[in-house]
A protein has these predicted regions:
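Catalytic cores and adjacent flexible loops of soluble metabolic enzymes
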Residues: 1-151
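Metal-ion/cofactor- or nucleotide/acyl-coenzyme-handling active-site neighborhoods
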Residues: 148-338
Length: 338
């Protein structure tokens, strides 16, 4: 018998080869599922192989009943939990790895496919067959902690930010809803606005801060001319002229804990620059079943959950020991901090 996965988008082709090479007259089992349903990246599509066997092996499978079953029972499930070919699982197959490695890195939500390819190439031969979370995490952090000489950049930013207030703009829906209030605060206080992992069209001056390679790549095309960008060193690719790069590990490893959350990294950077008061806008937090981001935001988080609110609130509480934090828009993090 034969059971196939769709890692390399070859299951239908391999099934045809299997049928041709089997011994004539010998019974065999060819495993398939409706619409290729199966844990990502999915399996051989039953409707495809049935149709192929009807045409080439004189079978009489009723495809219409299969299509009806897919329409009624399978497609609603696929809308909630998708499957099928993806670049991440192609990379797992390419490097002959357990597919959980790709899933683990994908859930980080910070890596481009190019980044994932580089990390997966580093997995030792003896660790390939069985997934090892500790190995994956070590390689992920090693890759993210690429070093740059950021002393001059920190001095430049400290000169600009020192003694001033900053406003951190996160992509929650409340940012748009409360923008008049936020803009009024920025103008009144002479604060420097800094967006976190996105560009906000209404923002005037200030900076865009990116610690997520995927977000940076996705927003490259919408970058405004002469916009000021701060990147952490884990963000690969071509930097724009004048972009400022800060060592990732300088921000990810706080005094008490590790965090890859962009808003937290940005606040830690502002602390290093001598900023004593920061206002937060668009820090909505996560709520199950709700639209948690601005319309058109590219960065919806894979695997986000309400438990993240508590963790981020703990990080914010740590940061509040060093600087004053003011929420300009409603936030579930603020509720958790009370």
């Amino acid at each position: 018998g034969l059971h196939l996965h769709e890692n390399l988008a070859l299951s239908f082709s391999l099934a045809q080869d299997f049928l041709e090479m089997r011994e004539t007259g010998r019974k065999c089992v060819l495993d398939a599922s409706l619409n290729g349903m199966g844990r990502v990246p999915g399996n051989l599509c039953m409707e495809l192989i049935m149709d192929y066997m009807n045409k080439n092996y004189e079978k009489k499978y009723d495809i219409n009943q299969v299509l009806d079953a897919i329409q009624e029972h399978i497609l609603p499930i696929r809308q909630q939990e998708s499957w099928g070919y993806s670049t991440e699982y192609f990379l797992s197959a390419k490097h002959n790895l357990h597919r959980n490695y790709a899933e683990y890195l994908q859930k980080k939500g910070t890596l481009t496919s190019r980044d994932m390819n580089q990390i997966l190439k580093m997995i030792p031969e003896k660790k390939k067959a069985a997934f090892d979370a500790e190995t994956a995490e070590k390689l992920y952090r090693k890759y993210e902690n690429r070093k740059v000489d950021d002393g001059g950049v920190l001095s430049q930013l400290a000169e600009e930010f020192g003694g001033r207030r900053a406003v951190v703009l996160a992509p929650g829906k409340s940012l748009e809803e409360g923008w008049k209030k936020v803009r009024s605060y920025i103008r009144k206080e002479g604060a420097i606005p800094v967006s976190a992992n996105f560009y906000f069209d209404e923002q005037e001056g200030g900076y865009a801060f990116f610690s997520n390679a995927r977000r940076y790549e996705e927003y490259k095309t919408s970058r405004k001319q002469r916009s000021n960008v701060i990147l952490t060193s884990n963000v690969s690719g071509e930097y724009g002229f004048g972009d400022l790069v800060i060592n990732y590990d300088r921000l990810a490893y706080g005094e008490k804990s590790y965090s890859a959350n962009c808003g937290i990294l940005l606040l830690r950077l502002l602390g290093l620059l001598g900023v004593k008061e920061v206002a937060l806008a668009g820090f909505d937090g996560y709520e199950e079943g709700k639209e948690n981001y601005l319309a058109g935001y590219f960065g919806e988080v894979y695997g986000a959950c309400a438990g993240d609110n508590r963790q981020i609130a703990r990080w914010l509480t740590e940061i509040r020991e060093q600087m004053k934090l003011t929420f300009l828009t409603p936030s579930r993090y603020e509720e958790e901090m009370r």
